[in-house]
């Protein structure tokens, strides 16, 4: 009988064993949290670049039906004009392409998260930027994405000389 009661007591975990398991899970979670946070940030940066690429494609669709001409607007107005000029392609449910997914705040109806060209599309050089994130879109310590006339999008760090150069070639 004594052996049977000893077996019954040994079936569960002790409090110390449970606490050790909880501590180990806590340590693993604290190690994974920064990795997950960074992965989510990178996903938003990629979504932001995708939005810029979609805006370029929208402009190309507009130009196809207007003898190769893009809207004559400059700066942020270029992106807003595409929204007005090609309404079936960018209705309210697709208006999300007008802002960067990294932004923590909502934009107004006449705002975008991107800068536009200081001149009309036809006057932009082949290697000049067509658009870019507004400063701070990716946080104060990061640069942003730049959209080029050929439709490619590149990411630049804040201290990269090209980021500073492109920022001055685009209007807010």
Predicted feature residues:
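C-terminal accessory segments of extracellular proteins
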Residues: 2, 124-172
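Short beta-strand segments
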Residues: 72-74, 97-102, 130-133, 147-148
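N-terminal leader/signal peptides at the extreme start of proteins
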Residues: 1-13, 172
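Acidic, glycine-rich loop-and-strand cores that form catalytic or ligand-binding grooves
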Residues: 84-127
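Conserved hydrophobic/amphipathic alpha-helical signal-anchor segments
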Residues: 30, 34-97, 152-153, 162-171
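Acidic-and-aromatic substrate-binding clefts and catalytic sites of carbohydrate-active enzymes
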Residues: 74-80, 105-108, 137
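N-terminal single-pass transmembrane signal-anchor helix
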Residues: 9-40
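Short, flexible active-site-adjacent loop segments at beta-strand->alpha-helix junctions, enriched
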Residues: 61, 103-106, 135, 152
């Amino acid at each position: 009988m004594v052996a049977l009661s000893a077996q019954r007591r040994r079936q569960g975990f002790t409090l110390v064993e449970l606490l050790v398991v909880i501590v180990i899970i806590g340590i693993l979670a604290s190690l994974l949290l920064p990795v997950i946070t960074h992965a989510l940030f990178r996903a938003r940066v990629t979504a932001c670049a995708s939005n810029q690429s979609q805006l370029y494609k929208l402009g190309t669709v507009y130009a196809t039906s207007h003898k190769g001409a893009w809207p004559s607007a400059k700066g942020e107005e270029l992106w807003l004009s595409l929204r007005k000029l090609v309404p079936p392609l960018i209705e309210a449910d697709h208006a999300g392409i007008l802002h960067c997914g990294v932004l923590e705040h909502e934009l107004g109806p006449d705002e975008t998260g991107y800068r536009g060209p200081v001149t009309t599309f036809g006057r932009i050089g082949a290697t000049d930027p067509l658009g870019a994130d507004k400063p701070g879109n990716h946080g104060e310590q990061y640069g942003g994405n730049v959209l080029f006339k050929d439709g490619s999008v590149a990411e630049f760090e804040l201290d990269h000389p090209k980021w500073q150069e492109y920022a001055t070639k685009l209007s807010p």
